[in-house]
Regions:
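Alpha/beta-hydrolase-fold serine-hydrolase catalytic core, especially in secreted/extracellular enzymes
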Residues: 2-141
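Solvent-exposed beta-strand/loop surfaces, strongest in extracytoplasmic domains of secreted
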Residues: 100-320
Length: 320
């Protein structure tokens, strides 16, 4: 359908959400077994719908139908919970039927990045940050089918880049910044892996398109001046508190960043902003924030991250 394994489009999320809603409604019961497991309703395949497996640019295909009324080859059909799910799938694919492909790539420092079809993530450039050590630039572009040169054969739209996963935040369409988050900074496989996705909408002539890119950042920076983070302790707060200031500093004078490791809160600049406390939470509720400083390759080493924890307590009712 012009998308792919790495797709993060809103319409894909909505489709997955619809499937999950159907699964919950049809499978879950209120019964719980002695060992604490929820009893599931069995699935009767004859109560569902069938739709033919999708083939690119297929001109004739069997119409999706109730199981017993399906006219196509049942051995080459997919099963769906109901009519709504089957028709949602058909509608998604019909959008791209008969349309031409368009292809995406990435430019870094004005040069088109190499594309290797043997790799799982087929574009894997080197991390090339600006002077601050964490900001980098990438530009999504339309290319020919070999991804070796730019092309004008594409939909009348501009490709955009979005985050899939990893320690990164998007600043604008071509600017990104290393930004660690609650996954942590001690995972050998994941801490340094950034994955982004270029996407391009389709039109009447072209299918939509996506292309992923993976960047491995060095973690940690081990060359250069050592640095340490000084992070004062944080006081407990009561429910209803709006925010809490953070005042960590680096002994090398570099700006310190933060992420929430656990608890109902978010980071906005140098502030912890509290979010609604989940129902049935047990008080006091623990919040842990991590201060980090990545350093600058060859000049300043990555600082050891520093954690600080505090508790959200129930607001005391003051007696008059």
């Amino acid at each position: 359908a012009g998308r792919g394994h790495f797709d993060v489009a809103d319409e894909t999320a909505a489709y997955i959400a619809l499937f999950l809603e159907k699964a919950v409604c049809l499978r879950l019961t209120d019964e719980v077994t002695k060992d604490g497991k929820v009893k599931l309703n069995p699935i009767n395949p004859t109560k569902g719908w069938l739709a033919e497996r999708w083939h690119p640019n297929q001109k004739k295909r069997a119409k999706a139908a109730f199981y017993s009324q399906y006219k196509g080859d049942v051995h080459d059909a997919f099963w769906y919970f109901d009519r709504e799910m089957a028709e949602a799938t058909e509608a998604r694919y019909v959008q791209s039927r008969g349309k031409e492909e368009q292809y995406l790539g990435f430019e870094q420092s004005g040069s088109l990045l190499a594309y290797d079809k043997k790799l799982h993530v087929r574009v894997q450039p080197r991390f090339n940050p600006k002077a601050d050590g964490i900001t980098f630039h990438l530009k999504a572009v339309c290319t020919d089918s070999l991804r070796t040169k730019l092309s004008d054969e594409h939909a009348d739209a501009t490709p955009t880049i979005s985050r899939i996963c990893g320690p990164v935040e998007k600043v604008n369409d071509t600017t990104f910044r290393v930004s660690f988050y609650r996954m942590g900074m001690d995972n050998p496989r994941r801490t340094g892996d950034i994955c982004l996705l270029a996407s391009q909408t389709g039109d009447r002539r072209y299918k939509s398109a996506v292309q992923e890119v993976s960047i491995r950042i060095p973690y940690r920076n081990t060359a250069g001046e050592r640095q340490h983070i000084l992070f004062p302790g944080l006081p407990d707060v009561e429910t209803g508190s709006g925010s809490l200031s953070l005042k960590a500093i680096s002994d090398c004078g570099l700006p310190v960043s933060y992420y929430i490791k656990e608890g109902p809160a978010e980071i906005e600049g140098d502030q912890i902003v509290f979010t609604p406390i989940p129902p049935r939470s047990k008080f006091p509720v623990k919040v842990t924030v991590v201060a980090w400083q990545y350093g600058v390759a060859g000049k300043v080493q990555t600082a050891e991250p520093v954690e600080r924890s505090f508790y959200i307590k129930k607001e005391l009712i003051k007696r008059l």
